[in-house]
Structures are given as C-alpha cells and as structure tokens.
Design a protein with these regions (language model features):
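A short alpha->loop->secondary-structure connector
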Residues: 96-103, 197, 201
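Conserved beta-strand segments of alpha/beta enzyme cores
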Residues: 75, 106-108, 203-206
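Polybasic, glycine- and aromatic-enriched phosphate-binding surface used to engage nucleic acids
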Residues: 277-481
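Short, solvent-exposed loop/turn segments at the edges of secondary structure
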Residues: 71, 218-222, 411-413
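Class I S-adenosyl-L-methionine
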Residues: 1-71, 77-95, 113-118, 131, ...
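Signature of N6-adenine DNA methyltransferases within the class I
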Residues: 5-6, 10-19, 40-48, 55, ...
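Conserved acidic residues
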Residues: 34, 74, 125, 205, ...
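Conserved SAM-binding strand-loop segment of SAM-dependent methyltransferases
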Residues: 103-114
Length: 481
C-alpha cells in the first residue's frame, strides 16, 4: 500500500458520512433508481451507508429482493485505487446486504485510478465522498496525471482539486456533488481556478465550515461543500459545524459576489464582508509597512543567548514568544553582507562557523554555496538600523498578542515587524482590541488549539485602513458580540 502522504487516504467517521449524505439530499424515496458514486471510496464508509439507505427505502415499497439486487448493481458505484482498501470495501458491502438476505451482488465498484475513468461522466445524480488529500510534492509517479486537470494548474496544488473536476464531470444535469475536503480551496492560490469556476457556474448551494474541528488524524482543516450542476444559484447558505456535538448550524444566506473579495472567498456575515471589502479593495495611505523577520534557515547556529563571541552580535527578539536573545549578524548595520575576510578574521567566529559548516551547507558543496556563512534569506536585514515593532502571528485572543518595540540595532525573527512613525500607544489601541481579533478570525487561517494566523499583508492592510480612518474612531469595523 502506498504511504498516506502519497495515497491521501483519510477514512471518514460514520457520523460525518451521514451528515454529508443528508446535506446532499440522499435520503427518502427520491434516492431510488438514482445513480450515486464515491469515486475514492476507500473501504466503503460512504457506500455502506448508501447501500443501507437504499435497501431501507426500497423495502418500504417492495419485497422483490431480486430487483433490489439489480438496483444495487445498477445505481451504486465506486472507485478505489488501493487493492487492499478495495477488497475491504467489497467485503463490507457484502456484510451489509447479508442483513437483507441478499447474496452475490455484482457491485459496480472498480479497483482502478479515478483520474483515468471517464465512462461515468454526465451520468451521476449524486457524487459524494472524501477525496484524497495529497500535496503536489508527494504525488510521486502521479504528478503528470494530476497536473493535466484544469483545477490543478495554479500554486502548490493538491489531489483533491482534481477530484472536484472529476466529480463535476460525472454529474448529470441537476446532479449534486457533496465532498468534504480541506477548506484551503477558498483562499489558496491552488484553489483559484476552482473559485473562478464557481463564480461562473453559480453552482454552489451550501458550504459548511468545520472551522477548528478536525475529524481526521490528518492535519487539515475541512469544509463540506454542496454543488448542483446546471441550475444557477444566485445565493448559497453558509453554515458552521459544532464538532463535539456533530451539529450543523445555519449562519447566513449569501451571494457569491458578496463573498468573493479579490479572488478570495470569505465566509462571514454581511457586515463583516462589507468591512473586508473596504479593507482589501479600497486604496489607503501607506502609513505602516509590515514585513517578515529574519529567515536565517539555521536559527540554531545564528541565534543563541550564549554565543561564544561578541563581535558582529546584535540583540534579537523572537516575535512568536516575546523573548530576547543574541544573533550573529554578519552584515553592516544597513544589512550589507560583510566580506569573508572580515567575518573570519575573528578567530572565535571563524572556529564557530567552521564547526557548523556542514550544517550550514545543508549537503551542498562550498563551491555551489560560497556564502554559506550568511543567512539563508535576505529579508529584514536592511531594517536592523530602524526602529520597529515586533508582533507574533499566531493568536487566539487579545491576551495572546505579543507586541514589543524593537530599537534600531536589533533584529526580529519568528514573526512580523511594523515600520511606522505612528506612536506605540496608537498601535496598541488598534491591535489589542476585540475588533482586531474579529478581523483575524474572519480571515479563517486556522491553527491547532483554536488559534488563528495572519500574513504581513493582511496585518498591513488592516492597520493602514484603521489609521487612514482614525479620525472616525467612533466607528468600529467588526461587530463585537
């Protein structure tokens, strides 16, 4: 069996299977003689519940078991690449139908690669499932097969995006697709073509954001999405999910034009969406700049409170923790690299760097990496000579914000820093507020433990918007409950 990273197999708990089938409308007598497929069926978590529901509804209307067997063979379909999971699936389906005294069903479940199957196209009334999550760098031999799909052309793509394209292709007119996948498609570069497709087709019916709740072992934040082919939907319903109680909560009925802001899909109430549109699309004065801190790519070498020398050493703040340390800074105060001769003329520094040389080269030759003794990237070097403010990027509430002044001559790493002439108290009033936390939550960049993160650009846009409108300080952007 392929590794999980290569196969993307993440098996779905039964309660979520039921939720997804309910969202898709696969219940009641309307499911009879309707085609349904799970095109990445694994051991049959969805197909087992589908068979159970079909048998239950059929037997309410007829006791003709021969016809029921024929229906199960005709209307229920599956695809699974892994032969072990495929055999488990067939066994599990046979176990289900044995309860109804059915035997030797000719299951239309195929042990093959869904990427190459086309004969289900335009035939399915329902496409459901939990498609595999595999990042592009883990696709191994499947890379070329995945990259020829339209939805996988941008960014660090993922296999589940190809399955969206496959699923849409399988639907008949009026057919419904309901997947649970990573929620990253709403805001990632990789998901941009899918978002454009949704804007054109207006086929989105429901979005259910599981937010911080993670039903799978895999480190992914997920979302249930329902689409309908051939029927234009002017709006869709956005829901959230109470994970520990398995309850779907309705939040807002929204238009796709409202939630698409700069080719990113945001999920929020209408007032928040309006505020986000003002922040991201309006032009504001450049009052602050927000940048990423040092990226030495070898913090364990360059940063330590106990460096065995004092030359070319500066104070450095770890923005993520608010703790100060010391950094070997082989640059001028303006961030220009010192020459090899200058750096290695100090015996203690020379011995220290030579001792860590193999680690800094990271398997490369000195010829290929002649400046191995410098930081891995140049970001933040030229701002050491400036006053600035450091801030962490992973927060859960205002108390978790770490904001500190960093004077000229000191550096910042593991977080962001702000360049501005605005006074510290004003910045604190903007950042240490529930309004700012509401903004961060609305970005939906989830981190484990209920935390959120944000980018340098998102922080810069927010602060500039607030400062540009500071004279109207009585107006709050985000509603605070």
């Amino acid at each position: 069996m392929a590794t999980r990273k290569q196969s993307g197999q993440v098996f779905t708990p039964h309660y979520l299977v039921c939720d997804i089938l309910d969202v898709a409308g696969y219940y009641g007598d309307i499911i009879l003689q309707k085609h349904i497929i799970d095109n990445s069926c694994g051991d049959g978590a969805f197909l087992q519940e589908i068979v159970q529901r079909y048998c239950t509804e059929y037997l309410k209307q007829s006791n003709n078991l021969q016809q029921l067997s024929q229906d199960l063979s005709t209307y229920i379909h599956g695809i699974e690449l892994d032969p072990i999971a495929y055999n488990e699936c067939i066994h599990n389906l046979n176990t289900i139908v044995a309860q109804y005294h059915l035997q030797q069903i000719e299951w239309d479940v195929r042990n093959t690669d869904a990427l190459s199957v086309t004969d289900f196209d335009n035939r399915m009334d329902y496409v459901v499932g939990n498609p595999p999550y595999v990042r592009v760098h883990n696709l191994a031999d499947n890379y070329a097969n995945v990259k020829h799909f339209r939805f996988t052309q941008d960014g660090m793509t993922d296999l589940y995006l190809a399955f969206y394209e496959i699923g849409f292709g399988m639907l008949c007119q009026g057919g419904k697709l309901c997947y649970i996948t990573p929620s990253s498609w709403i805001n990632s570069l990789a998901g941009s073509i899918l978002r454009q497709y949704i804007c054109i087709q207006h086929n989105l019916v429901k979005l259910i954001d599981l937010e911080h709740y993670q039903p799978f072992d895999a480190m992914a934040y997920t979302m249930i999405a329902l689409f309908e082919k051939g029927i234009r939907h002017e709006d869709f319903i956005y829901y959230t999910y109470i994970g520990d109680k398995h309850i779907i909560m309705s939040q807002e009925c929204l238009r796709i034009e409202e939630v698409m802001i700069g080719n990113i899909l945001y999920l929020a109430d209408r007032k928040t969406l309006k505020d986000l549109r003002n922040i991201f699309l309006q032009k504001h004065k450049q009052i602050v700049q927000v940048k990423n801190g040092f990226a030495t790519l070898a913090d364990g070498v360059f940063i330590s409170p106990h460096l065995p020398f004092t030359k070319y050493v500066i104070p450095v703040l770890k923005a993520s923790t608010g703790k100060w340390s010391k950094a070997l800074f082989p640059y001028t105060p303006q961030g220009v690299p010192l020459s090899h001769e200058q750096i290695f003329s100090d015996q203690a520094i020379s011995e220290y760097l030579e001792k860590n040389k193999s680690y800094l080269l990271k398997g490369q030759s000195e010829q290929a990496c002649p400046e191995w003794y410098l930081y891995g990237r140049t970001q933040a070097l030229k701002d050491v000579c400036k006053d600035k403010y450091a801030i962490n990027t992973i927060v859960i509430d205002t108390q978790s914000i770490k904001f500190e002044k960093v004077p000229s001559g000191a550096g910042v790493y593991s977080g962001l820093y702000i360049l501005t002439e605005v006074d510290e108290d004003t910045l604190r009033s903007i950042l240490y507020s529930e309004e700012f936390m509401q903004y961060v939550r609305s970005l939906r960049h989830y981190k484990s433990g209920g935390y959120y993160t944000f980018s340098s650009k998102e922080l810069e846009q927010y602060i500039n918007y607030k400062l540009d409108n500071y004279e109207d300080n009585s107006r709050t952007l985000f509603s605070i409950d």
